[in-house]
């Protein structure tokens, strides 16, 4: 198994519900180390840059409106098979299809307001991490 990094966002709906600690607890119990984290309020420009791949899709405008509606928490997670393990914790993007016990099954309201985001590949993880963090802001905990 490979030690890898993944990127995660706790979205405005989950921040508003005050469940950041619960989500972090799930990450840590799954063996994922939080090696960088920050809370911020995305600007329209930041949201458009981060979600550029979705521009032109029917949900794009609502996604930007939602992601700029309140603070988010972004973090880099590190651990064995971090991308796969993180996505398993999150559950399906659609909370109605998410397996019981996953973060989205427990806390999401809709496909957009689904509590969390997670990278779906090592390429996405690298791009998303670089969007929010400099290398100096990342503190590896596993070797």
Curated annotation (Swiss-Prot):
<keyword id="KW-0963">Cytoplasm</keyword>
<feature type="binding site">
    <location>
        <position position="93"/>
    </location>
    <ligand>
        <name>ATP</name>
    </ligand>
</feature>
<keyword id="KW-0479">Metal-binding</keyword>
<keyword id="KW-0547">Nucleotide-binding</keyword>
<dbReference type="GO" id="GO:0005524">
    <property type="term" value="F:ATP binding"/>
</dbReference>
<dbReference type="GO" id="GO:0006241">
    <property type="term" value="P:CTP biosynthetic process"/>
</dbReference>
<keyword id="KW-0460">Magnesium</keyword>
<comment type="subunit">
    <text>Homotetramer.</text>
</comment>
<keyword id="KW-0067">ATP-binding</keyword>
<keyword id="KW-0808">Transferase</keyword>
<dbReference type="GO" id="GO:0006183">
    <property type="term" value="P:GTP biosynthetic process"/>
</dbReference>
<feature type="binding site">
    <location>
        <position position="87"/>
    </location>
    <ligand>
        <name>ATP</name>
    </ligand>
</feature>
<dbReference type="GO" id="GO:0006228">
    <property type="term" value="P:UTP biosynthetic process"/>
</dbReference>
<feature type="binding site">
    <location>
        <position position="11"/>
    </location>
    <ligand>
        <name>ATP</name>
    </ligand>
</feature>
<keyword id="KW-0418">Kinase</keyword>
<dbReference type="InterPro" id="IPR036850">
    <property type="entry name" value="NDK-like_dom_sf"/>
</dbReference>
<keyword id="KW-0597">Phosphoprotein</keyword>
<dbReference type="GO" id="GO:0004550">
    <property type="term" value="F:nucleoside diphosphate kinase activity"/>
</dbReference>
<dbReference type="InterPro" id="IPR001564">
    <property type="entry name" value="Nucleoside_diP_kinase"/>
</dbReference>
<feature type="binding site">
    <location>
        <position position="59"/>
    </location>
    <ligand>
        <name>ATP</name>
    </ligand>
</feature>
<keyword id="KW-0546">Nucleotide metabolism</keyword>
<comment type="function">
    <text>Major role in the synthesis of nucleoside triphosphates other than ATP. The ATP gamma phosphate is transferred to the NDP beta phosphate via a ping-pong mechanism, using a phosphorylated active-site intermediate.</text>
</comment>
<feature type="active site" description="Pros-phosphohistidine intermediate">
    <location>
        <position position="117"/>
    </location>
</feature>
<dbReference type="Pfam" id="PF00334">
    <property type="entry name" value="NDK"/>
</dbReference>
<dbReference type="GO" id="GO:0005737">
    <property type="term" value="C:cytoplasm"/>
</dbReference>
<protein>
    <recommendedName>
        <fullName>Nucleoside diphosphate kinase</fullName>
        <ecNumber>2.7.4.6</ecNumber>
    </recommendedName>
</protein>
<dbReference type="GO" id="GO:0046872">
    <property type="term" value="F:metal ion binding"/>
</dbReference>
<comment type="similarity">
    <text>Belongs to the NDK family.</text>
</comment>
<dbReference type="InterPro" id="IPR034907">
    <property type="entry name" value="NDK-like_dom"/>
</dbReference>
<feature type="binding site">
    <location>
        <position position="104"/>
    </location>
    <ligand>
        <name>ATP</name>
    </ligand>
</feature>
<feature type="binding site">
    <location>
        <position position="114"/>
    </location>
    <ligand>
        <name>ATP</name>
    </ligand>
</feature>
């Amino acid at each position: 198994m490979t030690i890898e990094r993944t990127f995660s966002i706790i979205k405005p709906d989950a921040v508003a519900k005050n469940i950041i600690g619960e989500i972090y607890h799930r990450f840590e119990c799954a063996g994922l180390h939080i090696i960088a984290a920050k809370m911020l309020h995305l600007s329209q420009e930041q949201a458009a840059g981060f979600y550029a791949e979705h521009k032109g899709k029917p949900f794009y405008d609502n996604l930007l409106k939602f992601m700029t509606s309140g603070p988010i928490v972004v973090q880099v997670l590190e651990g064995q098979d971090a991308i796969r393990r993180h996505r398993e914790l999150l559950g399906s993007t659609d909370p109605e299809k998410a397996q019981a016990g996953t973060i989205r099954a427990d806390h999401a309201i809709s496909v957009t307001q689904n509590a969390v985001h997670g990278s779906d590949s090592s390429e996405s993880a690298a791009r998303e991490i670089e969007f929010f963090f400099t290398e100096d802001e990342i503190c590896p905990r596993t070797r």
